Amino acid sequence: MTTKPEKIIIFDTTLRDGEQCPGATLNIDEKLAIAKQLARLGVDIIEAGFAFASPGDFEAVHKIAQTVGTQSGPVICSLARARHDDIKAAAEAIKPAAKGRIHTFIATSDIHLQYKLKKTRPEVIAIAEEMVAYAKSFTDDVEFSPEDAGRSDPEFLYQVLERAIAAGATTINIPDTVGYTTPSEFGAIIKGIKENVPNIDQAIISVHGHNDLGLAVANFLEAVKNGARQLECTINGIGERAGNAALEELVMAMHVRRQYFNPFLGRHPDSEEALTNIDTKQIYKTSRLVSNLTGMLVQPNKAIVGANAFAHESGIHQDGVLKNKLTYEIMDAQLIGLTDNQIVLGKHSGRNAFRTRLKELGFELSETELNKAFVKFKEVADKKKEISDWDLEAIVNDEIQQAPDLFRVELVQVSCGSNARPTATVTLRTPDGEELTDAAIGTGPVDAVYKAINRVVNVPNQLIEFSVQSVTAGIDAIGEVTIRLRYESRVFSGHAANTDIIVASAQAYVNALNRLYASLQTQDKQTEVTA
């Protein structure tokens, strides 16, 4: 019999379901960087990918299992369809992890059975039972999901779950695959499972939901009240279509309203024990990392991690907050790792002070990474006399967490004005080490720079998104540029930061082109292998 956990288990699927968001494609090193940060955040399980989907996915899951899947670290999980080859690939990928999980699934709604699977109900039950048992032959930790459970016939759903648990599933995950249910409906589904699946006490009930109607977090909280003890979520709520339930919103909702949720977990209302293992002070840093690497910007009014989450415009609100924060703030910004943005370093600060402050902010850099970041810090400090924690974060993210360095910006010069045609000259270092220079005229300085870069790189693409944000206030603030471009049906993102937004724009564009170029090279190699 499985012992019910004392805390809510946080299952992070940013690297699997979150990466399915258009344009959020990550390379292996970026996935590893996020996995390491998720471990620092304190998630219980990392769904590292879908091992059978591609060689790249397999390698990413395997590398994360090797590096992050330590005895004291999170469980490393791979998704697998209810098929022998999928499950075998998942088992091989998670093998290096001290604690590994296989998550297998098959659809159970009539619409999926009829049109997608073309299977009968008895056939689906038999497949679920067989594949869970097969997964169990590789690991004791097996999760089973009845896809589209929210639209499945309850009686059939109960039968499938009972047989899956009997075959060895230790976690039963209930997905609202298309984000269709309302909180009361979703809570009723979980309650029905608790009451009608005879062996449900042998498994943990998990939930997975999408945000198509904006109800994912509300559905999950209702599920907790009805017996769910594992929540499958993503950082910033990224994912397919309208995204997934946001980890930061779920965790902070239960943290701030702990007295409300305590009784549903059999605790005294006034218990101060945390409901999850999450280190909330790592939330903001994790949010920024995922946003920077995926190119998925966080909307300013996003709960918990949005730029305006702790901002007050109304004079009445401002007056109240100045007198006592609790008048209009239900949580302290420092709870999620936001600092008061104190000025800590300047151009006279040395390497030791730089290293020490980065450690205090939670950055763990190798000596090579530290050297690169310190050089960039000195460059910024010469232009910007006051360096804040947010500036340091932008410097580290920009210098260390970048796309493969295939093309590199060596020079950017622009000429523009009210009576001049914007002209740009750029010099790029190619993957072969050659320096190429070209120039172009555009509708503005950024357009001219991008046209000049395209003349050098010569990879057809369409720019579909361009965004500039300042890291801090002030005329000398670092500007962060995020761009997304499309090549055929795929979307690639780029991110860069600089006190000169034209330079940042060039670097962000080249970062996105590097991702595109690396992808084309990988395709060519795979074509050669299969030819």
From Swiss-Prot:
Q: Which CDD domains match?
A: DRE_TIM_IPMS
Cellular component, GO annotation: cytoplasm
Give residues annotated as binding Mn(2+).
17, 208, 210, 244
One MF term in GO for this entry? acetyl-CoA C-acetyltransferase activity
SUPFAM superfamilies given for it? 2-isopropylmalate synthase LeuA, allosteric (dimerisation) domain (SSF110921), Aldolase (SSF51569)
Its function?
Catalyzes the condensation of the acetyl group of acetyl-CoA with 3-methyl-2-oxobutanoate (2-ketoisovalerate) to form 3-carboxy-3-hydroxy-4-methylpentanoate (2-isopropylmalate).
Tell me the protein family, please: Belongs to the alpha-IPM synthase/homocitrate synthase family. LeuA type 1 subfamily.
* Protein name, as recorded: 2-isopropylmalate synthase
Gene for this chain: leuA
